Amino acid sequence: EKLGIRLPIESHVLQAFVTEPYKPLIKGVVTFGAGHFYVSQSDKGGVVFGGDIDGYNTYAQRGNLPVFEDVIAGGLTMMPCLSRLKLLRNWGGVMDMSMDGSPIIDVGPIDGLYLNTGWCYGGFKATPASGYCFAHTIANDEAHELNKAYTLDRFAKGYTIDEKGMGPYPKAH
């Protein structure tokens, strides 16, 4: 807002959890869409898992008990064996959530300003491809062919992108 630009994004906390090390149990990442739960295992054996965002805007990097309980319940529904593991720690990270679940990758409304925000849950997973497209956008001062749909003005024009419930209110889609 300091630049006079209102972005259609909200900041929400996404919690993650890790257990004590355990023998190899999970290869890859397992997700449970109905319960908003995901789980994987680190190289050191810790079971890493998480779920839904806290349901309000915040910049705090800590989660709240209702989401903690919901994530644990989803995990135990999918993998009851997790109940025997000791939880070592949990943490929260701030997610910049666009209203349709898709990022904003665009030339900004101010000369020399470029936007790459609103990635919701998975921005780091898309970094190689989006980085290539964003570099093109900066170098040419126009969107790459692959990110032309991800403009800031799509919200004002009503051209939101249906990401199948990946925005800040996934249960509302």
Where are these regions (language model features)?
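A generic alpha-helix surface/boundary motif
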Residues: 11, 69-70, 129
